[in-house]
Amino acid sequence: MKQPPETLKEPRKHGNMEFPCAFYDSICTITSVSHHWHEEMEILYIEGSGYSVEVDTHDVTTEEPSFYFLNQEQLHSMKLSADCLEYAMLFRPDMLSFSSYDLTQQQLLLPLLGQKLLFPSRIPLASPAGQELKTSLLR
């Protein structure tokens, strides 16, 4: 994956050295988030009318509530209406890595860390995977 230009890198740090993860939730007060990227992966959930999400300059918007997965260094932007609900979790993928080497580390985590395994851009809430994500992440 080609790294986006440094000028679009988001300067904000998410989490800290001890816990490289951050959670955000809000009723949208910001109507636009310009193109940017960050070193963290992001799991984003949006519901409401009148929103759009762009990932790597491709519009992945739908009218239904959805989860969006933003891989490391993936360029993205959003336009949101005032009635949208937004939940976001940003994390450094290396925090998932084990200190011991096993099959999960070899077949799942190392490809994820090396960006050889990528999440899909969007998972609809109505799908079985979307329902599982809702149960796991939106408690």
Q: Predicted segment positions?
A:
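A short, compositionally biased micro-patch
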Residues: I46-G48, N71, S81
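A hydrophobic/aromatic-rich effector-binding and dimerization subdomain
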Residues: K2-F19, L75-R139
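Short beta-turn/strand-loop junction motif enriched in small, turn-promoting residues
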Residues: Y51, E73-L75
